[in-house]
Amino acid sequence: MKTTKSGSRVMAAVLTAAALGVLAQGTAHAEQYQSGATRWDIKGGKLMMVAGVLDDNSRLHYLNYAFYVQASDNALYLAPIVDDPKKLNDYRLNFSTFNGGGEILTDAVVAVKGASTYLVTAHKDAVHGYNRPAAVTTRTYRLVEGDEAQWRWYFAPVAQGAYSEQQNYTVERALAETAKALH
């Protein structure tokens, strides 16, 4: 096959682009959100999630999600995740994702449905190893505006879900279906 000088340049550009695409795919992670800030318009202001990489190597990938509400007065409030609304002193200031062996094992998604804002978390129990069928559990929290005696904003639990090993759910599918069913 005979190629011209410009044809060689085009071929080199195509091969370089393909190689960069393969490299980018190899380092991509499939969490719902990437490192950085994501914002949603919510009742009472804006919800901001800041995602930062905790650890990143060829096998394991963690992201740390922290949530803030920018109120209508422009004040920025940290929005913790509480496991029991009656015990607001039992809280987490962040949520960590986990991607192991190329599979998401723990992740979360934010869903804004009308005046309500939800955080849905999902975890796959990988006791039999990565990329194998396992039970997936979900937990749904609603963003609540507190008063002076509480957190100004916080995520309170409203529901739990479970998908059996036989259903062979992924974390992504459990998150998508749970978020879609919210009202």
Locations of the language-model features?
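Bacterial N-terminal signal peptides
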Residues: 12-22
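Intrinsically disordered, glycine/charged-rich N-terminal periplasmic/extracytoplasmic linker segments
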Residues: 2-4, 22-26
